[in-house]
Swiss-Prot record:
Part of the 50S ribosomal subunit; contacts the 5S rRNA and probably tRNA. Forms a bridge to the 30S subunit in the 70S ribosome. It comes from Methanococcus maripaludis (strain C6 / ATCC BAA-1332). Transmembrane segments: none annotated. This is Large ribosomal subunit protein uL5. Keywords: Ribonucleoprotein, Ribosomal protein, RNA-binding, rRNA-binding, tRNA-binding. Pfam families: Ribosomal_L5, Ribosomal_L5_C. Belongs to the universal ribosomal protein uL5 family. It comes from the Archaea. GO terms for cellular component: ribonucleoprotein complex; ribosome. GO terms for biological process: translation. GO terms for molecular function: rRNA binding; structural constituent of ribosome; tRNA binding.
Amino acid sequence: MSFQEVWEKEPMKKPRIQKVTVNFGVGEAGDRLTIGAKVIEELTGQSPVRTLAKQTNPAFGIRKKLPIGLKVTLRGKNAEEFLGNAFTAFKTSGKVLYASSFDQVGNFSFGVPEHIDFPGQKYDPSIGIYGMDVCVTFEKSGYRVKSRKVKRSHIPKKHLVTKDEAIEYIQTKFDTEVVRE
């Protein structure tokens, strides 16, 4: 029985995207970080959060707690829309998604080397080129029991998202090929 048949028969077993996290590692504070914030806000439609350096690295001119990156968490329709555009940019750059990018509970991540590969983006010399990491987290219906405050419980293993389920979902929903080594 294929995953599609199981999901038709039992809709609670169909995985869904919990969140998409977009990480911009700029590596320095200042103008480049400010411009990066505008780029990520234009791509996602949400204002980013600055990420801080965890340790000092004098070779790169980085001090502890200096803002050196940006991140945005997308959920719901915004996450699916952005992920569709990110896959388009990912394919445009000539990259492929490997099955080894998926972990055992179906989460995966990939990198988009240039933000200008996104649909509708043009190169602007004053902005430059920014790359980003896109991390996707999956869940199934009923996952709220592990995070609620009252009567918290764990998710049984048979209800966790598997690697193969996540691959099947991505291939059917976003028409993206996942290469198995």
